[in-house]
Amino acid sequence: MKKILKTLALSLLFIPFIAGCKAPVFYEIMRDVAPEEATVNGVITSITRYKFGTEEKLVTFSSDGLIWKDAAGTAHGQWSCFPNSNQLSGKIIKTAADKSNLYVVTITFHEDVEKGLNLPDAATLWWYDNNNEKWSEVSTPELLPGNFNIFCTNDVDNDNRSAYLRIDDKVYKLNGKDFPTSEKTTGNYNSVVSGDIFFESTASVKNGNYIYWGEGSKLYYSNDTSNPKAEGKKTLALDAGTDISCLAVTSDSILIGRGDFSNSLISKGGIAKTSLKDGIPGNSLESFSTNATSQLASVYQIYTLLVADPNETELNASIYASMGFKGSGSSTSVSYDNIGLWSYYPARGNWNRE
């Protein structure tokens, strides 16, 4: 049985992140470009590959709700509202898909007047019925209070797509509207269970015969897809300087999203990259030939990265990244106008708002 990498996140991604900004380096400022009209705003924690009939789509969410576009789209402004997404109640915090189904998790909140906070009240897993174009709630065990997350392989090959729901140390493989009656128990968050690989890191990606993942600020890789973290199987590639929050690959590069998600109010992260040759990553960070580091700068956090076609080179691929920052932003050169999704398209030749 083909072993497919599954990413296991440790915590619920509904922390109130905020975004923005530009690097204060003269050289980078000179490479800045006029901003496109922002069409996808808000804190975005996932961009999901989804096959709708015969069409390959990308699905994400914004402050306006659930949106999608053709995966082959290579221009600004192509996102549109997902069908009947007004049937969803609550704030969307995550999307996921397997080879046949699309899933969304929403959160409802209540106001704590004494504390002046909006606190999470309940979480709901939704399933989209392709045939009837309607959303239905999936009857799950209670998700809040507790630790849970939805995640998926997000593989380019639709046959390799699987989606999972983790509730504490139980992992359930999703399969449409009916919640599974069996689960996999992970004794720890770096385990192999029934041939499925689960990582504690949200930053992991598989490309060909290699797996790449982040542990803190360090990037590791392995060509042992059955148990890549086993003793003697993993290799340290480099230290990215700041905790690695997400990864994406092209044919010639590994793109590294960074973000400090500790309790510190100092916001730091930004995008970085290293080379990729015959599956082996470089041993140091390398400079971009685009304006990536001036737009996705080190004063904010990168939440997610996606390369539409990993077989393309970095300069010939359509690439998406979402970003944000923590704290008030008053002590750093950030802008609330930059919250949301950013993209690189070959025809445009630079990173800009999506």
Give, region by region, the residue ranges found by the protein language model.
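Trp- and S/T/G-rich repeat-edge/linker motifs of beta-rich repeat architectures
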Residues: 21-45, 49-53, 57, 63-161, ...
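Sec-dependent bacterial lipoprotein signal peptides
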Residues: 1-22
